[in-house]
C-alpha cells in the first residue's frame, strides 16, 4: 500500500483554506454589491413626485385620505418593482411652533411610517418589467384615517414614498418622497381673522403724463385688479402706495411711455379708469409710504431725510391725504431701532411678526399689529413646495392652528393674485374682522415679543445713489433758480430708489438715472462767448458777454469776471438774468480801471446760489482811457485859463472908460 503523499492534517488545512477563500469571495461580492447599490440609491429624489390631489372625504370612522399625483424617473438607472406607498406622521401638530418644527425637519428623518393595507399603495411596474429613466406614471392611493392613526384634532404631515430596486431582486430602497399637510377635525373656536391687501407696484413715474414703461397696463387688468376686488370683502383692509394711485390717475387722464426724449402713447387708459372705479368702492383703508421704500434700510443707515421726503411726496397726492399711515419692514420684523426710525412718520399701524400672533400691541411708533407672513408659503418638501396644492395645504394648516389657539388671532398679508385666491377660501373656523377689531395684547410691544429683527431687501449702497441724485437736483435747482421745484423733484423720485418692489438694485439705479435725465447739468449746458481782446477807450466802456442756454428749461445765472489784478481793474458781477430754453442773451458788463495796461481776465457763469456752471473763458482787457482822461483835464484847464485871461483883459480895458465917462 502506497503511502498518502499528502498527510491527512495537511488535507484538512487545505479544505479549511478553500472554505475561507469561498467565504471571503462571497463577502467580497456582497461588499461590491453594497458599494454599487448605494451610489444608485444615493439621491432620494431620483424619482420626482408631484402631488396633484390631497383631500379627506367622509367623516368619523369612514373618513378617507385621497392622495394622487405623478411619479417620474429622473435618475439614470432603470428601476424595477416600483411602488408608491402612503406615508404619514401620526404626531398631531397643534401650534404654529410645532408646525415650524415640522417644516424644519429633514424629509429623510426616521419619523412616520408607511401603510401597506390594500389601496394604500400602488404598484407602478412589476419585477420583470423595467421602469426606464424618463418614464412617468400616475398614481392614486387611499387610506382610512383610522388605519393611518390620524384621529385627534390637529394638523398632520402625510405623503407618499416611492420604493424600487435597481435589479430584479427584492432589495428595495426609497427613491422618492412627497409630503404635505392635512387638517383633521374642527377647532372648538373660531379665529379672529384679518387680511391686509397691499396695493403697490414697481415705480415708473417720470413726471406729469410720462411713465418709464407700461407694466401697469397689464397689472391693472391682472394682479392689481384681483387685489382691489379682494379688498372689498368683509374683514379685509387695504393699504395703498400713493405713488401707485398717482400713476394710475395719470394713466386715466392720458399718458405716454418712454423718456422725455422719446416716448409713445400708453395703452392702459381704459384699465386705469376701471381700476379707479373699483378703488372708489373701498373703505377703511390705509396708505403706505410713498414709493414703498425699504424702511429697514433707512432705519439701519439713519436716513431720516429720505423718510421726510416720503411724507412730502405723499402730501402731493391729496386724494389719499386723509388715510392713516401703515408701515412694515420687508421681512415683517421689528426692533427698537426700526420703531424709533418709523416713529418719525407717525404711523397708525406697524405690521410685524411677533410672538403675540394676531394681536395688536401698543408701541412708541403706533399700534403694532402682529401678522403671519408665512400664511401663503409653500409645503414641506422635498417635492415641489410651490404648487397650488402645497400653498392651499399650508394656508389651511396655518389658519387651522390659529383657530386652535384663538388668543393668537390670524392676520394675513395679500400681495399676489394667488394670495387673494387662497384668502378667499372659506374656512369654517375663521371669523373675519378688520384689523381695528383685533384683540389688544395684555402688554405693550417689547424686544421680548419680537419674532426677529427688521431687515431690508435693498442694498445700503443705494443710499449713496440717493445722495448723488440729491446733489444733482441741487445743481439743477440752483441753475434754474427754483428751490421749490427742487423740493418737489427730490420727494417725487428719491424715495422710490429704495422701493421694495424692484427686482434688483440695478433696476433702482437705472430708474433714477432716467428720472433725473431732464435735470442734468454739464459743462456744455450753458455756453459763454466773449471777445478775446477788449479795449477800454473811455470811463464808460462796456463790452458784451453772450450766454446761450442749450437746456430744455430756463436758467438763471450771473456773469462774473475775475482779473489778474483786481486793484488795477475790476468788473462788478452782473444782475441775475433769465435765459429761456434754447435761447441766447447778451449781458453788458462795465469794467472799472484805475490805471492803464493790459489785464488777464476770466469770465464765469454762476447761479444765484454761487455754483459755477458752463466753461469759463479767458480773455484780455486793455485799459487806455486813464491817459486820455488826463489830457482832457489838461486841455480843459487850458481852455478855462485862456477864458479867464481874456475875461480879465476885457475887465481891465473897460475900467478907464467907465471913469472918463463919469
Model-predicted regions and their roles:
Residues 2-3, 13-542, 547-548, 555-581, ...:
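N-terminal membrane-targeting/anchoring modules of bacterial envelope and secretion proteins
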Residues 8-9:
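Ala/Thr-enriched low-complexity intrinsically disordered regions
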Amino acid at each position: 500500500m502506497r503511502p498518502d503523499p499528502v498527510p491527512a492534517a495537511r488535507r484538512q488545512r487545505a479544505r479549511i483554506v478553500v472554505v475561507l477563500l469561498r467565504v471571503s469571495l462571497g463577502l467580497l461580492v456582497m461588499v461590491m454589491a453594497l458599494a454599487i447599490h448605494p451610489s444608485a440609491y444615493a439621491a432620494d429624489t431620483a424619482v420626482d413626485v408631484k402631488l396633484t390631489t390631497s383631500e379627506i372625504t367622509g367623516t368619523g370612522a369612514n373618513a378617507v385620505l385621497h392622495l394622487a399625483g405623478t411619479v417620474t424617473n429622473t435618475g439614470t438607472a432603470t428601476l424595477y418593482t416600483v411602488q408608491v406607498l402612503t406615508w404619514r406622521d401620526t404626531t398631531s401638530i397643534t401650534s404654529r411652533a410645532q408646525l415650524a418644527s415640522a417644516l424644519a425637519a429633514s424629509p429623510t428623518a426616521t419619523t412616520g411610517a408607511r401603510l401597506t393595507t390594500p389601496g394604500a399603495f400602488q404598484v407602478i411596474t412589476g419585477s420583470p418589467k423595467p421602469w426606464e429613466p424618463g418614464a412617468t406614471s400616475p398614481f392614486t392611493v387611499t387610506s382610512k384615517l383610522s388605519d393611518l392613526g390620524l384621529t385627534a384634532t390637529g394638523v398632520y404631515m402625510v405623503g407618499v414614498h416611492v420604493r424600487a430596486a435597481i435589479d430584479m431582486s427584492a432589495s428595495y430602497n426609497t427613491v422618492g418622497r412627497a409630503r404635505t399637510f392635512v387638517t383633521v377635525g374642527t377647532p372648538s373656536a373660531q379665529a379672529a381673522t384679518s387680511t391686509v391687501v397691499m396695493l403697490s407696484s414697481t415705480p415708473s413715474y417720470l413726471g406729469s403724463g410720462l411713465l418709464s414703461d407700461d407694466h401697469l397696463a397689464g397689472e391693472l387688468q391682472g394682479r392689481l385688479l384681483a387685489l382691489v376686488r379682494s379688498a372689498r370683502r368683509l374683514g379685509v383692509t387695504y393699504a395703498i402706495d400713493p405713488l401707485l394711485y398717482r400713476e394710475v390717475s395719470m394713466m386715466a387722464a392720458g399718458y405716454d411711455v418712454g423718456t422725455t426724449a422719446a416716448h409713445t402713447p400708453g395703452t392702459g387708459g381704459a384699465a386705469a379708469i376701471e381700476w379707479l372705479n373699483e378703488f372708489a368702492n373701498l373703505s377703511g383703508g390705509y396708505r403706505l409710504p410713498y414709493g414703498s421704500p425699504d424702511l429697514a434700510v433707512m432705519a439701519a443707515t439713519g436716513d431720516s431725510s429720505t423718510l421726510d421726503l416720503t411724507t412730502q411726496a405723499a402730501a402731493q397726492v391729496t386724494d389719499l391725504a386723509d388715510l392713516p399711515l401703515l408701515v412694515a419692514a420687508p421681512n415683517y420684523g421689528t426692533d427698537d431701532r426700526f420703531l424709533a426710525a418709523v416713529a418719525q412718520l407717525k404711523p397708525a399701524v406697524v405690521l410685524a411678526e411677533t410672538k403675540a400672533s394676531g394681536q395688536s400691541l401698543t408701541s412708541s411708533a403706533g399700534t403694532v399689529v402682529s401678522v403671519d407672513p408665512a400664511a401663503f408659503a409653500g409645503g414641506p418638501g422635498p417635492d415641489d413646495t410651490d404648487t397650488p396644492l402645497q400653498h392651499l395645504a399650508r394656508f389651511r394648516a396655518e389658519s387651522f392652528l390659529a383657530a386652535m389657539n384663538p388668543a393668537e388671532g390670524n392676520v394675513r398679508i395679500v400681495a399676489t393674485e394667488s394670495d387673494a385666491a387662497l384668502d378667499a377660501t372659506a374656512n369654517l373656523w375663521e371669523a373675519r374682522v378688520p384689523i381695528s377689531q383685533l384683540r389688544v395684547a395684555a402688554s405693550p410691544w417689547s424686544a421680548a415679543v419680537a419674532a426677529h429683527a427688521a431687515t431690508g431687501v435693498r442694498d445700503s449702497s443705494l443710499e449713496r445713489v440717493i445722495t448723488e441724485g440729491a446733489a444733482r437736483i441741487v445743481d439743477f435747482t440752483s441753475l434754474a433758480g427754483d428751490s421749490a421745484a427742487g423740493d418737489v423733484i427730490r420727494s417725487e423720485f428719491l424715495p422710490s430708489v429704495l422701493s421694495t418692489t424692484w427686482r434688483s438694485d440695478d433696476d433702482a439705479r437705472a430708474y433714477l438715472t432716467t428720472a433725473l435725465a431732464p435735470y442734468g447739468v454739464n459743462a456744455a449746458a450753458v455756453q459763454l462767448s466773449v471777445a478775446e481782446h477788449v479795449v477800454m477807450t473811455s470811463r464808460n466802456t462796456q463790452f458784451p458777454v453772450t450766454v446761450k442756454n442749450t437746456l430744455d428749461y430756463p436758467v438763471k445765472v450771473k456773469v462774473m469776471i475775475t482779473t489778474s489784478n483786481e486793484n488795477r481793474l475790476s468788473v462788478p458781477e452782473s444782475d441775475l438774468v433769465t435765459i429761456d430754453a434754447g435761447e441766447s442773451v447778451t449781458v453788458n458788463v462795465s469794467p472799472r480801471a484805475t490805471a492803464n495796461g493790459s489785464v488777464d481776465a476770466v469770465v464765469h457763469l454762476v447761479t444765484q446760489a454761487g455754483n459755477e456752471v458752463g466753461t469759463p473763458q479767458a480773455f484780455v482787457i486793455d485799459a487806455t482811457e486813464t491817459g486820455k482822461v488826463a489830457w482832457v483835464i489838461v486841455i480843459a484847464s487850458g481852455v478855462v485859463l485862456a477864458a479867464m485871461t481874456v475875461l480879465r483883459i476885457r475887465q481891465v480895458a473897460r475900467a478907464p472908460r467907465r471913469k472918463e465917462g463919469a
